[in-house]
Curated annotation (Swiss-Prot):
Alphabetical list of Gene3D superfamilies matching this protein: Phosphoglycerate mutase-like
EC number(s) per entry: 5.4.2.11
UniProt-listed PANTHER family: PHOSPHOGLYCERATE MUTASE
Name of the top EC class for this enzyme: isomerase
GO process terms (BP): gluconeogenesis; glycolytic process
InterPro entries: His_Pase_superF_clade-1, His_PPase_superfam, Phosphogly_mut1
Record-annotated site: Transition state stabilizer: 180
Catalytic residues in the record: 9, 110
Keywords: Gluconeogenesis, Glycolysis, Isomerase
Function: Catalyzes the interconversion of 2-phosphoglycerate and 3-phosphoglycerate.
Protein's UniProt name: 2,3-bisphosphoglycerate-dependent phosphoglycerate mutase
Annotated source species: Chlamydia caviae (strain ATCC VR-813 / DSM 19441 / 03DC25 / GPIC)
Amino acid sequence: MAFLILLRHGKSVWNEKNLFTGWVDIPLSQQGIDEAIHAGQVIKDLPIDCIFTSSLVRSLMTALLAMTHHSSKKIPYIIHDDEQQKLMSRIYSDEEKSMIPLYRSSALNERMYGELQGKNKKETAEEFGEEQVKLWRRSYKISPPGGESLYDTGLRTVPYFQETIFPLLKNSKNVFISAHGNSLRSLIMDIEKLSEEEVLSLELPTGKPIVYLWTGHTFERHPEPLG
């Protein structure tokens, strides 16, 4: 058995400005920082063996802030993809036992919003029409100009989860994923076997952990909302 913790990052500066963010690398706002800290207090007693974030800083900030409250007192350390940096950052002492590996991957990045990135959501609706923007944002396979649909997002998140993260869970490793609304929705769609209609109605608030237990055969969602 193993725990899987999913956490949408805390509110970002552009969330507060009502701007499409996507892959633009925007940090957390003060509210987002507070949300990440609160989330850490909620999950502080759940076992965590490894952490995964997207390549975007708001996802990383959320994970690091949340872990400052973990009861294990273990320190996250980033495992870099670059082989030279990985070699140069090796730890040669027992200090490694007091740390938790953190892996970053663009496979977990937010849905890329293409030509909408940086634009105000209200002004975009006025420019293109509310129905068109609703199609871009809330349909499953329709993507904004130059961007990704939720379906496209799942084409990178789900294989990464199945090939990299799921084997750890099957090996009884407890995993914490700090990512984004749409990347997590695509993962939950796969985990819970949701239909297209069901995933479109799925809303994930910022800074609210979702916890699953991998039983060895299936994922069981924690029955009560956390936090």
